[in-house]
């Protein structure tokens, strides 16, 4: 479809409502205004007018707003018709507009895509629109607004600018090798490179927290039957989400709860007790449990404190630990402290976190909540923070890898050409975040996930 067509779509959710909005963008927006309104409204002023059908009869009446390009959201001429929110009325008005020559229904996200293509916002800001709509907490919404206002993009532009200056310096050293000063070995380039690498690492840290706010942390509760996994799920969820009995193997399928801890979204997953299955249904449940464990951001290894005094995971259940992915973070949760009399608290044991609590009474649950926040580097202070997507994290990781490789070339061989190439690749990876170097396929995937009227 052509990006020069004039597009129209409903900008409010489908269904009944007090107000329904149709948005038109493109060179024929003024023609739509003359046909439906009988006049072109004064730019950026609200005008209360009847909306006319082709025969002159009134379909509805409401507010019309006209924004001539480039001073509009999309950078094109934009007309918004704000009428009553009945689906029949909106459908009649939409059909009236589509009957005009050169008009078509907008693709999902096409208004935002045109804003991007017309340099009204960059790709990270465009994605922030969708993230703001989908925000599941106040902090996620505030961070999405920061991204929309350019907080994330500004950090990326600073890094790109620093890399540009560094590339100029490196390439000058390559082009003028006969100068008395060896620019590659005098330490100045390495100092600048180290500074950029440190700044990039700080942005990566903030982006990881932004991704956490957007997507949530996946925490899987795993362990033997009757260790208290479902009781812990209920305690974290604050409700009876799972059935709890003294019968081993009560939980046979995966149970999911979505909760927030101080604005941080968590996906808590309760799984079937791990043991040799007694029947086919239990076997399937245990297989699903392992699938969830392998995809987790963190595992809460639930231990019945009345059955063992051990605190090291390998000593508690070596076969379980042997099957876990080596890089998967684990927190050992010694449950039933109300029975064993153990002191509630969090400690570190040989690189693993250990927490003593009682899922039945709720004692120690607040300690676990704080631990989950801290383990993911989450802080309650997100003022100035931004949201990030997985593609952003991947681009930042790629850029960091190129800078590390460039640093190795510099300190080991003073290989200016190789360093310059690594700097260029790092710069390109960063520019993909804001859309300065992005394939049409990537843009299509991003904007297709938006609402129709966005």
Swiss-Prot record:
BP GO terms, sorted: tRNA methylation; tRNA wobble uridine modification
Localization terms from the record: Cytoplasm
GO molecular function terms noted in the UniProt entry: GTP binding; GTPase activity; metal ion binding
Entry keywords, A to Z: Cytoplasm, GTP-binding, Hydrolase, Magnesium, Metal-binding, Nucleotide-binding, Potassium, tRNA processing
Binding site for (6S)-5-formyl-5,6,7,8-tetrahydrofolate: 23, 80, 120, 454
Residues reported to bind K(+): 226, 245, 247, 250
Binding site residues for GTP: 226-231, 245-251, 270-273, 335-338, 358-360
Cofactor(s) needed for function: K(+)
Function: Exhibits a very high intrinsic GTPase hydrolysis rate. Involved in the addition of a carboxymethylaminomethyl (cmnm) group at the wobble position (U34) of certain tRNAs, forming tRNA-cmnm(5)s(2)U34.
Subunit: Homodimer. Heterotetramer of two MnmE and two MnmG subunits.
Descriptive protein name: tRNA modification GTPase MnmE
